Amino acid sequence: AEIVEIDTTENDFVLTPEMLEKAILEQGNQLKAVILNYPANPTGVTYSREQMAALADVLKKYDVFVVCDEVYSELTYTEQPHVSIAEFLPEQTIVINGLSKSHAMTGWRLGFTFAPAAFTAQLIKSHQYLVTAANTMAQFAGVEALTVGKDDAEPMKREYIERRDYIIEKMTELGFKIIKPDGAFYIFAKIPADYN
């Protein structure tokens, strides 16, 4: 496979339907898959329901498969909750997620996917050769996180918003250009040219 990058820098790191369609057509409609991660690492960019639906329309039109990293889905800071592209393209999407960010379980190596059955069968083949299994303690903790602790991300979100706003204020005072992240926990700042 050949990687095709779509530069979103000039659009505040937001992929638009026009950018996506242009990339597909430049590849002679041979583009097979798109990898999306949102909230994005490292920019914190998120997408509205309308933006996601518009991207899905293009992907459906050209029958492009989607691999979507949604590990920060519980850490969005806008009024609108996270919207998965799988809502619009359930038969064309593999969603990758986990508990490392939403439940502060980094290092536990506990993740999961949502995918159509045909893809899942293929994923299992790869998985069984790459990973033995999550340890028993992590599996029990994961069940607890997804049931009893399903709202555990809320206090973290409030804390991250406070930290984000503080860092943005201070870095802006120092002359950094920052696009306010609507998710994840990163600040992707442009370093001023005269900064030493």
Predicted regions and their residues:
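PLP-dependent class I/II
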Residues: 1-196
